[in-house]
Amino acid sequence: MPAWFYILRLKSGTLYPGATTNLEQRWRDHQSGQACRTTKLDPPVALVLHEQFETFSEARRREAQVKRWSARKKEALVSGDLASLSDLAVSHDHGGLRGR
């Protein structure tokens, strides 16, 4: 069953990532304040990005990945700024020196 990763722009300007198997219904749920507390308190104004996946678990993995990103990196993804995405990537490899 196909699934989607999506990003909403909220009224405050914040980008909100999510995943669903029914993009149209999830959008309606967010707009009506029935999807989650975040969008109930800060309603969405636009669906700014969506990516289709073969399974819901793949879409959820993408959601988890993007939720860890900085606001600047999410903005780069939404705007299609691939150069900035690369520049904003942070290496978590400490060269094996952790704890030394």
Q: How would you label these PLM feature ranges?
A:
Residues R37, A64-L77:
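Short arginine-rich
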Residues M1-H50, S57-A64, L82-R100:
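GIY-YIG nuclease catalytic motif and its immediate N-terminal context
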